[in-house]
Design a protein with these regions (language model features):
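Long, internal scaffold/assembly segments composed of regular secondary structure
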Residues: 328-431
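Structural signature of alpha-solenoid helical repeat junctions
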Residues: 121, 189, 279-282, 286, ...
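Acidic, Ser/Thr- and Gly/Pro-rich intrinsically disordered linkers and low-complexity segments
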Residues: 77-112, 256-281, 336-355, 413-427, ...
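Hydrophobic core segments within long, regular secondary-structure runs in both alpha-
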Residues: 122, 126, 147, 165-180, ...
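Fungal C-terminal regulatory tails
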Residues: 413-431, 442-591
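Acidic, Ser/Thr-rich, low-complexity intrinsically disordered regions in fungal proteins
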Residues: 127-352, 417-418
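Amphipathic alpha-helical repeat scaffolds of TPR domains
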Residues: 123-124, 128, 185-207, 369-372, ...
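Transcriptional activation interfaces
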Residues: 3-177, 183
């Protein structure tokens, strides 16, 4: 778009100024000198930032937010962008939707407000993309089983001087400020900017050797709490919550105007009706994206969803009669949501055609969201001290989703892992990320079930059945092992595969491993951290049974599986300070 094509010029004017003497937390548009400005044009141009955004976020949004799977979509005839070439679809359609909404009098924006919204979106894209800046010492370092420790003084000094780190702090600070300036402005560009910025982890300020705490090898008993303390440094999902609330407000306004409510002119209804089909569909796609982010973030951070079930009922659910024996009459039902009877008449098997594989992976995305939504139901029911039969009802429906996954997408994904080198690059990125998200939700579910059974909160019969089947232990072990397998293949450099004629040319910043194409880093951090701790604790437990014949084999296997997960975190650490610290801590525990 024109607004984004001028990003380089705008940033050029921002970074040109006097000497860079202020703290990074208080950067102003004129606080970076000519040296930095020149280096910016040499190392990190506007086209590079947009290329990274395109190769990471839009690459995944073409799978996550498809017309064929959007529950708020009526027309499903759009051609999916599954090929080796794709556009910045969501970005372009968001910008267009704001223009169309203004012409239909759905939005009232002054010229200065339009400029502020566009600026916020540009800066959110830049803040997101600079996470993949590859000039720092840390980004160039190769993986080794011998940790150098996170507080190596030389590395810290270099990190503080590295230009890419300056860019990360600068753009995060500028995007944060720009979004604060438009906090009261309801439009689609602001909501989209908030969604994008919610994925940009705030760069941490490096600690000097004198300020940083002594780095000691944690014991096996303390590693879980040590990992949790690092993860807790991440703040609440404020921007995804703001985006969900804003997107819900905009959809509420559109639905009201479409029915003739709140119109300031009788001619407005005709304006909405004359909106192009694609633009009306964009409203549904963006709303689904916001609900998806809200659902995953709410369960992951143990917070209430912004948009309740009753407020975000999907199209095919509107005619469903509410149940009379539940406090959540509009709870998402998996058979209705997925438009399936639960019976699996056909399962995709690998090898298969590219389109068939892409369709299967795309259809798995809503199943993942549905599981996170049910994890949230269980969290809320426990907070409310719901009756045992209500808890078991949620558990039963959640396990239906789990079983459905294992009979369909789960089996297909295992086959993709086994033949990973022959899987097309875009399919790799899609299924690796969705699968890792799924397994994090399963691990969260296992923790909740453990809490229910340990505290005798559910029904005795159901508790005894879970105990007899070792269900909770199986949930944890299966998901952790699959995460280990994912960590192994997702850290293989993409250049090891034989490229086909239709292989996309990804930006070099994401070619060191498929895992680097993940846009929502926090999900993978939590998933691989939990799996790492699981295997390290298992290895520690095996030490108590050294006399058994299978000790050596099982012990080595546990350590190898832990290392697969730690390496995944280490590679994520090239763009995430949190992942870097976790990889260092877990690697110390591994030794």
């Amino acid at each position: 778009s024109n607004s984004l094509s001028s990003l380089s010029a705008r940033n050029s004017s921002r970074v040109r100024g006097s000497s860079f003497g202020e703290s990074q937390s208080g950067l102003s548009p004129f606080s970076i000198d000519q040296r930095v400005s020149t280096s910016f044009h040499r190392q990190m141009t506007s086209s590079n930032l947009l290329k990274i955004y395109h190769d990471v976020l839009e690459h995944h949004l073409s799978c996550w937010v498809a017309e064929t799977t959007c529950p708020y979509q009526v027309v499903k005839i759009a051609t999916p962008e599954w090929s080796a070439s794709w556009t910045n679809r969501i970005l372009h359609r968001t910008i267009r939707l704001d223009h169309v909404a203004q012409s239909c009098k759905l939005l009232y924006l002054t010229p200065s407000e339009k400029k502020a919204a566009s600026n916020a979106l540009n800066l959110a894209v830049s803040a997101f993309a600079t996470q993949w800046a590859q000039g720092s010492v840390r980004a160039r370092r190769k993986y080794s089983t011998t940790s150098q420790g996170p507080n190596d003084s030389g590395a810290v000094i270099n990190m503080m001087e590295d230009f890419d780190r300056t860019l990360q702090h600068y753009f995060w600070s500028q995007a944060h400020r720009a979004l604060s300036d438009v906090a009261e402005l309801d439009c689609y560009q602001v909501a989209c900017a908030e969604l994008i910025f919610s994925l940009a982890q705030r760069p941490w300020q490096p600690e000097t050797p004198d300020q940083s705490p002594a780095y000691e090898t944690p014991s096996a008993e303390s590693i879980r709490s040590h990992v949790q303390s690092i993860i807790e440094r991440d703040g609440p999902p404020i921007y995804s919550e703001r985006a969900a609330r804003r997107m819900h407000t905009l959809k509420f306004r559109c639905d009201s105007y479409n029915k003739g409510l709140g119109l300031k002119s009788k001619n407005l209804k005709h304006g909405i009706a004359s909106m192009a089909r694609e633009d009306r569909d964009t409203i549904g796609l963006l709303y689904w994206l916001a609900i998806m982010f809200d659902t995953v973030a709410a369960s992951m951070y143990e917070r209430p969803v912004v948009v309740t079930d009753e407020e975000c009922r999907y199209e095919v659910q509107r005619d469903v009669v509410p149940l009379c024996d539940t406090n959540l009459p509009y709870r998402w039902d998996y058979e209705i949501f997925l438009q399936t009877s639960g019976e699996v008449s056909h399962r995709t098997s690998w090898p298969c055609s590219y389109d068939r594989a892409a369709e299967d992976v795309t259809r798995s995305a809503p199943v993942k969201v549905l599981l996170f939504r049910h994890v949230s139901y269980l969290q809320n029911a426990l907070r409310k001290s719901s009756a045992p039969h209500q808890l078991e009802d949620i558990v039963f429906n959640t396990m239906l989703i789990y079983d459905y996954w294992n009979r369909t997408h789960g089996q297909f994904f295992k086959e993709l892992v086994q033949d990973f080198v022959n899987v097309p690059q875009r399919i790799r990125g899609w299924f690796i990320c969705i699968s890792a998200h799924w397994h994090l939700a399963v691990l969260m579910l296992a923790d909740l079930l453990d809490f229910i059974d340990e505290n005798h909160l559910g029904l005795e019969g159901a508790r005894n059945e879970r105990s007899a089947l070792c269900m909770i232990a199986r949930l944890r072990e299966d998901s952790c092992r699959e995460l280990s397998d994912l960590g192994h293949v997702a850290t293989l450099p993409t250049y090891l595969s034989t490229p086909s004629e239709d292989s996309p040319e990804f930006h070099h910043a994401v070619t060191e491993g498929t895992i680097l194409t993940e846009p929502w880093t926090m999900i993978l951090i939590r998933a691989f951290s939990q799996a790492s701790v699981f295997f390290l604790e298992r290895a520690k437990g095996l030490c108590d049974f050294r006399a058994t014949s299978g000790f050596v084999c099982e012990f080595k296997t546990s350590l190898k599986e832990a290392e697969n997960c730690i390496k995944a975190l280490w590679l994520l650490g090239k763009k995430s300070d949190m992942a870097w610290d976790l990889a260092e801590a877990l690697q110390q525990a591994l030794r």
